[in-house]
Regions:
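Electropositive polyanion-binding surfaces
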Residues: 2-6, 10-16, 25-27, 35-37, ...
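Compositionally biased alpha-helical segments
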Residues: 50-61
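Major-groove recognition helix of helix-turn-helix-like DNA-binding domains
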Residues: 108-113, 126-130
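A short, conserved structural fragment
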Residues: 115-127, 227
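Accessory beta->alpha helical hairpin/"wing" motif in late/C-terminal subdomains of nucleic-acid enzymes
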Residues: 124-140, 236
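Short, amphipathic alpha-helical interaction segments positioned at domain boundaries
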Residues: 136-161
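Low-complexity, highly charged intrinsically disordered N-terminal segments
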Residues: 168-272
């Protein structure tokens, strides 16, 4: 190259013009820019040669002249001509087309236009080839989309800043949802989030100068007012729907406005019976009631009335399929997520006091020992007389209210029935149970005791389940029978060495196998029954609803709606959904239990050593007796099963499921590993 040649090269991502001064060695040249700054370059770095005869002082004027010619719109006109001709051009040819000459300024301007263009031309060697009409159309479309996305991104950031400054002041747009949902999924699934979601969420966090972590995403969603500080991540990780689809709500409304014809027109009128419904005060879905009467022959008959949602639901309709998808009503400390829309579940489906209700009634006569002597199952009409709480019934039984001999008779038969089941090998486990409620951000824990009222209701429900299973077995009816294999319990001598109460029950509980659902009747070990089927919660447990469909069809003399094969298929999907619901309930209760302890960090609790988790590591399961919470604790001293302790929370983090307990009289605070609650 000659001294004085004006060339273009790139430095730090920008064009630079410089004049060739001299060679530095065999491979490099020294060039000088308009600031008289020297640069050492390799000839391969030169991207355009303008020509000889220039000095560095002329560079600014040359650049100014070029700038006046840089009109990108002119390229479109040139492209239209060249694409029609199918001709490629170099900068000189483009200069001729655009400016009608090949002056250095215009040639360089043409070079700049062509090299910066990403739409109309594609470089191939030293020439530029016009793109096809379809290619240009596609690129324009892509550019429009990119511009729109950039605008949406900038608008989203603006709205995010506004929402952070004034929570609740922003009306989020549809275009915001993908980024916000990615942020939610990143906060929910953490390291397991989809990589695309993680990337989008991290871009938002980085733009707002926040840590690019799932925890920061959670905090941002709370700060934006989109999430609550105690957002239920377990529920969000599940497939459990929170809202009902419009079609399901529409059908519920339709059934309320125009009830369908009753398939059981010949319901038995049992409205003369006094019916007690017994539930917690917060219960809204009332699905069982109890009666007692003396027959003309002097025998006593118990009635267990179960709500009849099949009066309002048919197999395969929208309400049924949605209930099947949900599988169960979910009971969380913060409220319930029902299996059916609330307006119909707590309305005509429920056994509401004073109203004539449709039911499936189980009439049972027991032997003096408590075995089933005779039974009848009938679709019925009843009128619940009293809605009682467990506390109401306990008080009535304690005071011996003379005006309610029926409730006393039911309680008496409940005790007889319990003793009979014990004689049949039933295994009773009475562990303290915590009922955790959250109302207006206040967390309360109530310890549920095994009162007479709860025992009598449980016995009557078990009795109805035995009768339903007997009916199904007698008529070879496909039903979701529930069974439990016989456990291998520790030897009696070993159990007697353990302190009675929770410690001993905990040892027995650990040996109990899971109950199973099968189409074949089999023994249920812990209930002490040869056959059993759950039928007493059809509003809130789909497998119970299935049993109602089957039994009621058979009572009418019809073919059951589900064959054995169909029932098995439905039960498989329902069981998976029900297991997920149990997991969400357990984890949510665990979270709020830890949150309660966090808020009472200075309180002292009476603890009981239940059993060893890993004795060689001094890791045990302890029961906080006032709360019914079971937690892991590592000891730095020898302890015995059944030993009572005074405990305090040393550290708790509900969101990360970590709690450290310490003995008040022991100065050493032991760091505890994260251990899942064992229940």
């Amino acid at each position: 190259m000659q001294k004085g040649t004006l060339i273009e090269f790139w430095l730090h991502g920008h064009r630079h013009l410089a004049v060739v001064d001299r060679p530095k060695d065999n491979k490099h040249w020294i060039v000088v820019d308009h600031l008289n700054q020297a640069h050492t370059i390799n000839p391969r770095q030169i991207t355009y040669t303008i020509g000889p005869g220039y000095t560095t002082a002329e560079i600014p004027a040359f650049q100014a002249a070029v700038a006046t010619q840089l009109d990108p719109d002119s390229l479109e006109v040139a492209w239209e001509i060249l694409v029609e001709e199918g001709r490629s051009v170099d900068p000189a040819a483009m200069s001729t087309l655009l400016f009608a000459d090949t002056e250095p300024v215009n040639c360089y301007a043409a070079h700049c236009l062509l090299s910066e263009d990403k739409l109309y031309f594609k470089q191939k060697g030293d020439v530029y080839e016009p793109r096809s009409v379809s290619q240009v159309a596609d690129l324009k479309h892509q550019a429009t989309i990119a511009q729109q996305r950039q605008q949406e991104w900038e608008t989203l950031l603006s709205r995010l800043q506004q929402a952070l400054a004034q929570p609740g002041s922003v009306d989020w747009q549809a275009s915001d949802r993908p980024r916000l949902e990615a942020l939610e999924r990143y906060a929910t699934f953490k390291e397991e989030a989809n990589p695309r979601d993680a990337t989008q969420a991290q871009e938002v966090l980085a733009a707002l100068q926040r840590p690019e972590t799932p925890e920061a995403a959670f905090d941002l969603l709370v700060a934006l007012g989109l999430w609550q500080p105690h957002e239920n991540l377990f529920l969000r990780r599940s497939q459990i729907p929170v809202q009902f689809p419009p079609t399901v709500l529409a059908m519920a409304t339709s059934r309320l406005d125009a009830p369908p014809a009753d398939a059981d027109r010949d319901r038995v009128d049992l409205t003369h019976l006094k019916v007690y419904t017994i539930d917690d005060i917060s219960t809204l879905e009332i699905d069982d009631g109890l009666s007692w009467e003396v027959l003309p022959d002097g025998r006593e008959q118990l009635w267990i009335h179960i709500a009849d949602p099949t009066r309002w639901v048919s197999p395969g309709d929208e309400l049924d399929l949605e209930a099947r998808r949900r599988s169960t009503t979910l009971y969380l400390p913060t409220g319930m997520i029902p299996m059916f829309p609330p307006e119909i579940a707590t309305g005509p489906m429920s056994l509401n006091q004073g109203q004539v209700c449709c039911a499936l009634s189980f009439g049972v006569i027991l032997t003096p020992a408590g075995a089933v002597d005779a039974y009848t199952i009938v679709p019925s009409r009843i009128r619940p007389t009293y809605r009682l709480t467990y506390e109401d019934v306990d008080e009535m039984l304690e005071l011996g209210v003379q005006a309610e001999p029926e409730i006393a008779a039911i309680a008496r038969w409940g005790m007889v029935r319990s003793q009979w089941r014990q004689s049949q090998g039933a295994i009773a486990i009475h562990m303290p149970e915590a009922s955790i409620k959250v109302q207006d951000d206040e967390v309360t824990i109530q310890l549920l005791d095994n009162s007479l009222a709860r025992q009598l209701v449980a016995e009557m429900m078990i009795l109805a389940g035995e009768v339903a299973a007997r009916y199904g077995q007698a008529h070879n009816l496909p039903l979701p029978f529930r069974n439990q294999p016989q456990p291998e319990l520790p030897p009696e001598t070993e159990l007697l060495q353990l302190p009675p109460g929770p410690v001993r029950y905990s040892a027995i509980r650990r040996c109990m196998p899971r109950s199973e659902v099968s189409l074949s009747p089999a023994r249920h070990a812990s209930l002490g029954l040869d056959t059993y089927a759950q039928v007493t919660s059809p509003i809130r447990r789909y497998s119970d609803l299935l049993a109602h469909f089957q039994i009621k069809a058979h009572l009418r003399g019809e073919t059951p709606p589900f064959s054995a094969e169909q029932l098995q298929e439905v039960l498989m999907s329902v069981s998976a959904a029900a297991q997920e619901a149990v997991w969400v309930e357990r984890q949510t209760n665990r979270y709020w239990g830890l949150e309660f302890l966090r808020r009472h960090a200075t309180d002292l609790w009476q603890g009981l050593v239940l059993r060893w988790l890993r004795e060689h590591e001094s890791l045990a399961l302890v029961l906080l007796e006032e709360l019914g919470l079971e937690l892991a604790m590592r000891f730095d001293r020898p302890v015995a099963l059944g030993e009572q302790l005074t405990l305090r929370v040393a550290y708790v983090d509900p969101r990360n499921d970590v709690i450290h307990l310490r003995e008040v009289d022991t100065p050493t605070v032991t760091d505890l590993p994260k251990v899942e609650q064992l229940a």
